[in-house]
């Protein structure tokens, strides 16, 4: 399921403009997207879109709207968007396991400040595919006050979280292959200049057919600045227990940025989509050359890695090599699938 926003404007009378917020669903085995009901109201174009849709497994999704000056509201569906019911957004209770279809996030460790501006400490929460409610994970990995979980599981069923090693204070990642009941943590190899750089913004992990890749995202020193700077790329051949730093970004050379996740393929192949172009490696990330294709944002979904390119063009891959393209909300075909 996806959330689509279509706006109608009137240049002569801007107050007549409106944006319709709709849901489209691609049912299992179907060849095309179909419109479904949405609990969201029409909004004026000047307000901007504040809603987001989170898929929680087949036929299940959560819509969250509001924040800032707008009231917070949430709705959950378990029947593919045919009906929606209101759910609360606050974290309620604890869960010992991350169920299939769940999505991970964070919230403030109680007591949280009111209004919430910045948490002193954050915790990992599980958005349940059963009811769309948030519950704190009972046994999270020990990765400091700002754990950063990947939203969804990797293809092998593993869940990943990045943060700070509590002993050394260095950047680290942890994975679980038993639904969050236990975690294995490892420290990432530090750059020689790590002490002179600000803290990382994030570590983005992608599991491939024969290796795991972890991209460090954070401010660079020297060279042309970017909005999504990649400091380094690490590779693991033992499922994330140990790491080798294969790429360190310098003042020149590409890739210097990464839009979303690295795309791992077989036999040492990995692609990094930068802000200007994609770059491919066939030696496990030690060297890169320009690849075909335009700029894209890469993220993990339940159907593989999703490439979001131009306004209405998308593609998915399960092996990092073959991509299945489709259009969604294109002007000449609204909506379509393939």
Regions found by a protein language model. Give the residues of each.
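Extracellular glycan-interacting surfaces
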Residues: 1-338
């Amino acid at each position: 399921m996806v959330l689509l926003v279509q706006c109608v404007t009137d240049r002569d009378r801007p107050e007549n403009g409106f944006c319709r917020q709709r849901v489209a669903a691609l049912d299992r085995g179907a060849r095309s997207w179909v419109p479904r009901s949405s609990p969201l109201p029409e909004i004026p174009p000047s307000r901007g879109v504040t809603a987001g849709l989170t898929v929680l497994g087949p036929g299940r999704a959560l819509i969250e709207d509001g924040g800032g000056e707008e009231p917070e509201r949430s709705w959950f569906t378990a029947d593919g968007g045919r009906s929606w019911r209101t759910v609360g957004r606050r974290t309620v209770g604890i869960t010992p396991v991350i169920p299939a279809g769940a999505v991970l996030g964070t919230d403030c460790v109680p007591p949280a400040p009111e209004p919430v501006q910045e948490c002193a400490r954050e915790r990992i929460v599980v958005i349940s595919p059963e009811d769309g409610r948030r519950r704190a994970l009972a046994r999270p990995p020990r990765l400091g006050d700002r754990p950063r979980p990947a939203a969804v599981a990797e293809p092998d069923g593993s869940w990943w979280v990045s943060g700070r090693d509590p002993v050394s204070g260095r950047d680290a990642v942890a994975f679980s292959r038993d639904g969050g009941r236990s975690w294995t943590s490892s420290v990432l190899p530090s750059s020689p200049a790590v002490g002179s750089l600000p803290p990382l913004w994030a570590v983005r992990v992608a599991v491939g057919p024969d290796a795991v890749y972890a991209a460090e995202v954070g401010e660079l020193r020297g060279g042309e600045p970017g909005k999504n700077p990649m400091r380094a790329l690490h590779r693991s051949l033992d499922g994330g227990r140990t790491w080798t730093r294969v790429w360190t970004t310098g003042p020149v050379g590409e890739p210097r940025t990464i839009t979303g996740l690295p795309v791992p393929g077989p036999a040492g192949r990995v692609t990094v989509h930068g802000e200007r172009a994609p770059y491919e490696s066939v030696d496990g990330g030690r060297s890169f050359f320009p690849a075909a294709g335009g700029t894209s944002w890469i993220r993990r979904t339940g159907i593989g890695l999703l490439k979001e390119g131009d306004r209405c063009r998308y593609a998915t891959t399960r092996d990092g090599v073959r991509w299945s393209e489709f259009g969604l909300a294109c002007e000449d075909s609204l909506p379509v699938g393939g």
